[in-house]
């Protein structure tokens, strides 16, 4: 290859490695991602493609046999799993099976009887499912970090950001949290998206919230105190309407979280280079799909409620009667398997698929969805800068780099 062609190839690689600016999170500020070309000036661009890649690998980090892109993707996934372990731990403390399984699950005590009862109205096995989902997320985070360490790549630790308050309800540990489950605005558009027979977010389509009441303003998905977790033998649900509304919100939030992981692993798998890393993403991603399918099914059992007063906001809210969705294929609760829809192009036959799976800004979009959900209300700018940086690195990854 002559020098002109070499320079042209290297410049093309540099152009290919530039990513559309990822959407910034609130509080993130003008943080620039640690691009894989950091430190390579104009003279460096004139290097051959092989030399450029070699210098990049050594300049960015010691990542063993991992490419910087694979390491960046795994780090973002480790952070996402740590965030999930934090929120699932809170659900497990209050509504899960109270069985400690070190090192994955610790700190469980008595649980919260009223909240657990309210969740059981969605399914009698909810406590077990919550416990198992929690254990799974802990195992994912621990494995990914251990794998990164084995490859001499940087790992992820979010302990410095565990600063958000805990619920004061019986069963909750009084420790710092990464996530806030008490001021959520739950996106339920996944419910209509997976029932659509013509729409696909990867093709520019948008979807309405199925449960509008929890998709506006702020709602708690765990009891904030014992006044919000009350048994009521006179109620058909065995708990107060407020406690049941909180559990209904949680039921839809469970599915929201896991549908995000379902897409994220499929999206980032398309960018990894190493076959073993691909195996990791496909293997863990499959469990996210199993989680989503479970919660999708249980959410549809949430009982109807009328005139529930939120003691914090003062709002009076109703939870819709989901049995009225019967016969409406856009909303029917038992249609939990993805309806076939357009994929890649509307010129192809419809196909039952996970959606979305397009890769552009996938990590940043995941963080934005968590932020819009209210998971990070109360977190500081330093947290947003850190996780936004991880997302930008993951989104900049390309197969082969």
Which residues does each PLM region occupy?
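All-alpha RGS (Regulator of G-protein Signaling) helical domain and cognate RGS-like helical scaffolds
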Residues: 2-31, 41-42, 57-401
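N-terminal export signals
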Residues: 35-56
């Amino acid at each position: 290859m002559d020098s002109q062609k070499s320079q042209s190839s290297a410049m093309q690689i540099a152009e290919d490695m530039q990513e559309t600016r990822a959407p910034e999170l609130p509080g993130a500020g003008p943080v620039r991602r640690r691009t894989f070309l950091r430190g390579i000036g104009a003279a460096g661009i004139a290097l051959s493609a092989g030399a450029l890649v070699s210098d990049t690998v050594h300049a960015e980090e010691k990542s063993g046999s991992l490419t910087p892109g694979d390491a960046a993707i795994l780090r973002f996934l480790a952070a996402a799993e740590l965030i999930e372990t934090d929120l699932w731990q809170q659900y497990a403390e209050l509504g899960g099976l109270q069985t400690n399984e070190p090192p994955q699950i610790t700190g469980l005590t008595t649980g919260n009887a009223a909240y657990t009862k309210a969740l059981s109205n969605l399914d009698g096995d909810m406590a077990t499912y919550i416990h198992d989902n929690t254990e799974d997320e802990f195992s994912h985070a621990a494995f990914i970090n251990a794998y990164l360490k084995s490859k001499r790549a940087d790992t992820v630790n979010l302990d410095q950001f565990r600063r958000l308050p805990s619920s004061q309800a019986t069963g909750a540990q009084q420790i710092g949290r990464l996530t806030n489950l008490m001021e959520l605005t739950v996106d339920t558009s996944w419910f209509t998206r997976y029932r659509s027979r013509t729409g696909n977010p990867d093709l520019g389509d948008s979807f309405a919230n199925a449960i509008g009441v929890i998709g506006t303003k702020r709602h708690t998905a765990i009891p904030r105190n014992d006044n919000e977790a009350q048994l009521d033998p006179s109620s058909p649900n065995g708990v107060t309407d407020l406690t049941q509304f909180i559990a209904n919100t949680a039921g839809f939030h469970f599915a929201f979280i896991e549908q995000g992981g379902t897409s994220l692993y499929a999206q980032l798998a398309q960018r990894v280079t190493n076959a073993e890393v691909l195996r990791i993403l496909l293997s863990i991603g499959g469990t996210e799909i199993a989680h989503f399918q479970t919660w999708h099914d249980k959410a549809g059992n949430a009982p109807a409620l009328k005139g529930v007063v939120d003691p914090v906001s003062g709002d009076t809210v109703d939870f819709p009667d989901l049995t009225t969705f019967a016969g409406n294929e856009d909303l029917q609760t038992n249609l939990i398997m993805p309806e076939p829809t357009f994929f890649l192009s509307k010129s192809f036959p419809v196909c039952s698929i996970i959606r979305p799976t397009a890769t552009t800004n996938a990590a940043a979009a995941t963080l934005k969805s968590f932020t819009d959900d209210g998971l990070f209300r109360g977190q500081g700018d330093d947290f947003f800068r850190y996780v936004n940086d991880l997302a930008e690195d993951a989104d900049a990854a390309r197969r082969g780099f």
